Each structure stands twice: as C-alpha cells, then as structure tokens.
Amino acid sequence: PAGPIAAVASRVGLDQFDVEKLEGKTAEDIRWLNQVAVRHNDIIRQAARSSPVLPLRLGTIFRSKDSLLAAVAHCRKAVADFLQALGDRQEWAVKLYVQNDRITGRLDGPHLNDAVMSGAEYLRRRGAELRRCREMQTELQREITAVEDRLAARTDRRRRVRPLPDALTGRREKMVYNAAYLLPAADVEPWLATVHETRDTMQKKGLLLEVTGPWPPYHFCPELTISASESTSK
C-alpha cells in the first residue's frame, strides 16, 4: 500500500525475463511467456473485482520494493486521477471476422483452363476482378464503420486495435476489426443487447461479431513516466 493506492506485485528472477531469451522466441520460450501472460492477466482481473485498477505492461520489473514505492509516489497523481475517472467502467473487446470470401474479395490466380484465353480477354477479366475486389473492400469498411458507430453510441470511449493475424487467432475466419470499448457498469446490459442485435445482422452479411469481457482497462491507461533507475521493461 502507498496511501490510497496499492501496488500488486510478485517476485521474479531477472534471468527469467532476459531480453535475449525473449527475443529468441524458441517454442519453449513462447510457451513459457504465454503461461506468464495468462497468470499476469488473471492477477489483474482478480484485483479488478474489488477495485479500479491500472494495469502495467507485462514485463515491467522493479528492481526492489523501494524502487516500486518510489515509482508509485512519482506517478501518484496520474494514477489517482485515472482511477477516480475510471470508477466502475469496464473494458469490453469487440472483434469482427469475415465468415467467407464473398465480402473480402480475395482474388485467385488464373485457372488452368484460362490458359487458352487471349491476352486481352485475360486483362479484361482480371480488371473486372480487381474492380470487384475494391467494391468488396469498400463494402467491408462500410459495415465496420456501421458496427463501430452503433456500438459507440452507448460507450464513453473506444479504441481500435490492430487485428490479430490468423496464426494467433487459430480460426479459419480472418479478423478484420478489433476494438476496445469502455463503458459504465450500469450500461453494460443494454449495450450487450445492442451487440447481440448487431451480431445477428452482421451474420446475415457473412460477418461474425464476437464480444468478450469485462476486462481491466488495458487499452485506456495513461502512459506513466517511470525512470530506468526505478524499473526495467522488457
């Protein structure tokens, strides 16, 4: 505890968070890092059940208890202002996936039986495919904007996040939208009703809408200035 603010921390060995080890990204290191990330998230979510929290980035290491307390003292006002403004607000994650190739406009290469086409005919067909691709992408962006505007109406803040690559999602569908929404606890139920209505509408258009939460406010935290003498962040 540091006055009205408390820090939740655990002891780790600096050798476990060695930069070269993390940058090496061996299969064993990735499995270990995934386990650490899950544990890190679990602790933050447990703390968030009883109090507003300001999550620090995974891998933020304080070299001693004194350096941790010094960092808390240095950032006390920024942390206190954020926690007071946060109140009971919750972060919810919204992701949108393309269910099939119809709306993405993915283009295949020429088929084997197209080899007999003349050059002019090939260029004509290819041009038509490219125009269709642009139209599909425009339609997709229009749908994404419609989803975002509708869901943002009941939220305080929203933030777009880079969509995850297929290798990380483990899904056949391609993620085309990834965002975090922050809203008061009292507004969650009606907001989720809007999400479910929107999900049903999007599914008819070949899009899958996914919502998860509540989460700690990972994407809405202020940047804290912590000197190198107080901590090291990998």
Task: Give the residues covered by each predicted segment.
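An interfacial alpha-helical scaffold signature
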Residues: 1-234
